[in-house]
Amino acid sequence: MAGGPPDAGMAYFSSNEKTETLIALAWALEEGSRRFYTGLAGSMTDIEGKVLFTELINAEERHKASLLALYHRSGGSGTIEPLLPGGAAGDVMEGGIRVSEALEWTAGRDAADILDLSIALESNAYDLYIKMERTVRDDLAKRVFSMLAEEEKHHLDRMTSLIEKKA
C-alpha cells in the first residue's frame, strides 16, 4: 500500500448540469462523508478527535437534510437516491475518494494524520460548493450552496484548531 493519503481529487461536473443533478451530487458526497466520519468516530482512540468527528456526523446529516429540502423546493419529489448513478449513495465522499479507501488508509494512523486527510477533504468540499454556487442560476440553490461552503469552512477551522492544539 502506498504511504501517502488517497488522492483527494475534485469531483468534476459540467457547468451545464441541472440544479437537481448538482443537488444529488452534493447529497451523495455528504452521505459519503457521513459514512467516513462514522467510521472514524467508531475507531479513533483520541477523545477530542472522536468528539469532533461525532459532531461532523451530525453536520453532514444536516447538510443532507438541507439538500433534500432544496431538492423538494426545486420541484423534486421523494428521495434523491433515484437521481444517483445506480440509484443509491455510493462509496464516494467529499474529495472524490472512496470511503473504504480513506478508512483503510486511516487504520493505525495517529490523529494528526487523520486530521490532515480530513482537512484536505473538507477543503475540496468547500471549493466544490463555491463552484456549485457559481454554476446554479436558482437563487435558493445559490444560498444553499453558499451556506454549505460556509459550514465546510467552519469544519476546516475546527479541524485546524484541533491539529494545531495537537502539534
Set out the residue ranges of the language-model regions.
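Non-heme di-metal
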Residues: 2-167
